[in-house]
């Protein structure tokens, strides 16, 4: 996602046509390291704000997040074996992304479907209405 999908595809195809396996340049390696550092910092920040609560008969970690949800969810679950899954709430996008690394839960069926969403056993999502954002504002400024 650093280069954009189309540019990346064209780059890969030209490398393959040149009969060389796509290799990253030193510049590419630096860019990837910078991006990985950004992701790592974001995960550490969100780890500090995560809270846990029961949900759907399991222990859920809750965090407000709008970026890097796959990396964030998987890493938080690995950092906190006491949680069964994590729910990442994107208040601006009105979405919730669910992630787990455990085998005994099907997030699509056991969690997301209860909130009008769906997905796979280890990755799922659901949406909520704009009115929820208004309720949050009312609660904060009440």
What is the role of each PLM region?
Residues 36-142:
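Gly/His-enriched, cation/cofactor- and phosphate-binding structural elements
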Residues 1-50:
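Hydrophobic, aromatic-enriched interface-forming segments
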